[in-house]
């Protein structure tokens, strides 16, 4: 038995290494901690996002099960297509064969097929909204190809995954945009079997419905950028191809006036539509959760329309000089900022929208067609939003007033209101309008002018940038209140593309000296730590405010404590059962019905103002301002630190591209490695409070690292590590440019790179002094120190090819991406960028 246990442990360890190796998690350098940390990051990344265990191999039976589960009608129509397939074949052959059928519905379904396994839903199983499941085997013990997750978690892990198997990236884009709604949002959950959303549960205080925002823009954009890098030109053919669709989530965002009146309660649930969707799912499959046309088929549109729908939903909530209004009942990346929902305005989303719009500008500027057909309803929304920007361009000459800010928001918001009302009531009529690509370019340019103006307006006096602001709608317009600094804002602005390398350096300099930096972990807090008001110092009404209100004075004199109470020391407090200003307003209505009608009519607004001045609820951000772990006060959230790491690396790379001076480049490199040195794998267990090479969620101010493994941190670090090693893809060509690789990573003695080839077989490659090894798309890559840069490709058939320089051409690069085993190893002679 003991030997059986030992054998099983060895087999399990081998299989685990194979899983990590399939996603390029095996590296050998002199920096053992970095290599081990990368192994852990890759492991946890695939545990969240899943893994293509058999790479591009498609199992015919599983594909049929998938297509039939989505649309039984379409499967039956295309039965001959599936009958003609081999039992197992390459994914690229599936996409090519589906394209040749000229059947858009079949193409769409095949593009959405992702044979992932080893994925589990992210989230604490104790949370009632996480129906937790780990499914890796079928009932008969065979491998189950399945994935499921909250969309904002699973898509970020797919970004890092796709770097090791990049020919799936367009399918990931398809999965993403086909899960977005006509009004521009994504439902909560996504699985292999389709999308899912939360429903109202009146008896469950934890249940709620709504949409997240900032993730959507930046996660989709990262896939688009990857596609452009790895497969230049591929997305352009999708821009005019009707291969995409809209999710039909039965959420109904209320009208603009209702949003202004109560921005906390903005979404109704359409029970009737939900029932109809259920009937459609029963009839055809998961496609029943998509918007249908007037012929009871899935309504399909091109990628241009889908990309526009996403950004128009953001710009319709744009408040000049403030950001994107958070009015869909959900926070953003930081769940702990939950109280910002309603009156919060996100500069974080605007920073990412800036990068997104710049990408669209470049994309539309490069297309070969002059016009593209878009749904009539969306064109009307596009024209309304564009004309709002054009008509108000003169406002960019100076600071925008509250009045003009309110007028602009009103035009943008009402345009979206009109669009949504039509879609909710009648769906799409099915008519298209030809839109000139020149007009799309102009729209991107004009919107970018307003975005850049707002970014400049949100540079703080200390040189940092605002992350979130607060809006107050009044009869005179929209007022802005600025909140305290947050790490999230600095990361987003560094990633926005708006700053020059020199400006990015200035932000990093100030950040290191700010209250966001904590020396105890040589890292960064989400927000400055602070002392909270003690309980005995809360709910104290200044005597001068009581004297301002005849109603409050009358109640004190009458001994009526339903609104205000006085204590034995002569102090005043609001009723202790109140939880917000609405509680106070409700109490005043009761008083009006009981003899205080005149005084309530006179002082209702004043008392509400006093209440808000006492509690300042508007500036309460949520759990982030009232707890001490997770994303709370004094807490380091390692995912945001890794986002900062990657943003600093992007700033360094931009400096290279723009030929920034040596001093700037040196200081940017210093910042990168300073941020890197604060991450756990560079620390002792005593300092980190956990195994240093393992990723952890957060470190509270009073303890060591908490919540191991299942953190979004791993995604950014996987990406950053590959860039540290210098692997880049430019116009479809693999390039080795180790601009930030340190010479100390090269081996001081001999070693062995153990890896797994595309067939899953364990292989080894000897390494000598002055070398290092890793895999890329499961092809072993060996770096050797040399003065002249060159590449030696070894092929599976025994051939070899020498390349002068640091770039592999696009055809050979595609052979690497496609994992067909053509290239068996890559030897690169080079000099690292740093000593």
Roles of regions detected by a PLM:
Residues 1-835:
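Acidic, mature catalytic/reactive cores of soluble proteins
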């Amino acid at each position: 038995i003991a030997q059986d246990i030992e054998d099983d442990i060895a087999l399990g360890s081998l299989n685990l290494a194979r899983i990590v190796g399939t996603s390029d998690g095996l590296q050998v350098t002199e920096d053992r901690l970095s290599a081990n940390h990368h192994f852990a990051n890759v492991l946890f990344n695939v545990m969240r996002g899943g893994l293509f265990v058999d790479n591009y191999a498609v199992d015919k039976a599983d594909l049929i099960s998938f297509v039939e589960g989505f649309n039984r009608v379409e499967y039956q129509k295309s039965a001959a297509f599936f009958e003609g397939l081999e039992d197992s074949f390459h994914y690229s052959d599936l996409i090519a064969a589906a394209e040749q059928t000229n059947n858009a519905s079949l193409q769409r379904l095949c593009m959405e097929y992702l044979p992932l396994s080893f994925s589990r839903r992210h989230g604490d199983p104790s949370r009632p909204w996480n129906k937790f499941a780990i499914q890796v085997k079928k009932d008969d013990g065979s491998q189950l190809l399945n994935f499921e997750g909250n969309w904002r978690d699973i898509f970020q892990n797919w970004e890092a995954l796709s770097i090791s198997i990049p020919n799936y990236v367009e399918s990931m884009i398809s999965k993403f945009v086909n899960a977005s709604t006509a009004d521009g949002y994504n439902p909560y959950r996504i699985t292999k079997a389709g999308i899912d959303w939360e429903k109202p549960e009146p008896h469950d205080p934890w249940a709620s419905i709504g949409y997240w925002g900032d993730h959507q823009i930046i996660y989709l954009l990262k896939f688009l950028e990857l596609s452009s890098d790895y497969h230049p030109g591929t997305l352009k053919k999708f821009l005019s191809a009707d291969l995409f669709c809209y999710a039909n989530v039965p959420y109904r965002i209320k009208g603009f006036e209702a949003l202004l009146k109560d921005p906390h309660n903005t979404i109704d649930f359409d029970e009737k539509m939900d029932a109809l969707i259920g009937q459609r799912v029963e009839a055809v499959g998961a496609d029943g959760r998509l918007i249908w046309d007037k012929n009871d088929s899935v309504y399909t549109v091109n990628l241009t329309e889908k990309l526009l729908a996403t950004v128009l939903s953001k710009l319709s909530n744009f408040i000049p000089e403030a950001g994107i209004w958070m009015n869909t009942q959900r926070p953003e990346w930081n769940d702990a900022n939950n109280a910002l929902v309603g009156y919060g305005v996100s500069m974080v989303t605007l920073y990412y929208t800036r990068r997104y719009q710049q990408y669209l500008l470049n994309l539309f500027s490069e297309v070969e067609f002059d016009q593209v057909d878009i749904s009539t309803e969306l064109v009307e929304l596009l024209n309304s939003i564009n004309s709002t920007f054009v008509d108000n361009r003169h406002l960019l000459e100076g600071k925008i007033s509250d009045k003009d800010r309110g007028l602009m928001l009103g035009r943008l918001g009402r345009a979206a209101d009109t669009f949504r009302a039509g879609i909710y009531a009648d769906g799409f009529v099915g008519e298209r309008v030809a839109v000139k690509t020149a007009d799309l370019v102009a729209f991107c340019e004009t919107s970018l002018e307003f975005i850049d103006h707002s970014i400049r307006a949100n540079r703080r006096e200390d040189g940092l940038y605002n992350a979130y602001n607060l809006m107050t709608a009044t009869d005179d317009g929209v007022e802005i209140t600025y909140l305290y600094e947050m790490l999230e804002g600095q990361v987003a602005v560094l990633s926005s593309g708006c700053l020059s390398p020199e400006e990015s350096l200035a932000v990093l300099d100030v950040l290191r000296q700010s209250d966001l930096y904590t020396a105890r972990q040589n890292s960064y807090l989400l927000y400055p730590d602070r002392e909270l008001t003690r309980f005995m110092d809360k709910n104290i009404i200044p005597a001068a405010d009581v004297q301002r209100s005849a109603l409050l004075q009358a109640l004190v004199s009458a001994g009526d404590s339903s609104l205000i109470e006085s204590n034995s020391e002569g102090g005043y407090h609001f009723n202790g059962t109140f939880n917000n200003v609405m509680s106070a307003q409700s109490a005043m209505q009761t008083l009006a019905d009981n003899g205080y009608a005149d005084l309530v009519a006179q002082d209702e607004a004043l008392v509400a103002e006093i209440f808000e001045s006492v509690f300042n609820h508007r500036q309460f951000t949520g759990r982030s301002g009232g707890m001490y772990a997770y994303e709370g006060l004094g807490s380091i959230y390692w995912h945001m630190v890794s986002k900062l790491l990657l943003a600093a690396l992007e700033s360094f790379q931009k400096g290279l591209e723009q030929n920034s001076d040596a001093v700037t480049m040196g200081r940017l490199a210093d910042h990168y490695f300073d941020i890197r040195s604060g991450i756990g794998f560079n620390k002792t267990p005593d300092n980190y409070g956990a195994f240093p090479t393992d990723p952890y969620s957060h470190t509270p101010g009073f303890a060591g690292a908490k919540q191991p493994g299942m953190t979004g941190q791993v995604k950014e670090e996987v990406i950053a590590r590959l860039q540290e090693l210098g692997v880049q893809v430019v116009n479809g060509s693999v390039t080795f440019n180790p601009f930030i690789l340190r010479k100390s990573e090269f081996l001081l003695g001999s070693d062995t790179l153990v890896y797994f080839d595309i067939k899953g077989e364990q292989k080894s490659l000897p390494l000598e002094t002055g070398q290092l090894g890793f895999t890329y798309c499961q092809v072993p890559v060996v770096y050797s120190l040399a003065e002249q840069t060159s590449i030696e490709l070894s092929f599976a058939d025994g051939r070899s090819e020498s390349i002068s320089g640091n770039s592999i051409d696009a055809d050979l690069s595609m052979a690497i991406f496609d994992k067909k085993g053509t290239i068996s190893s890559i030897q690169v002679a080079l000099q690292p960028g740093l000593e």
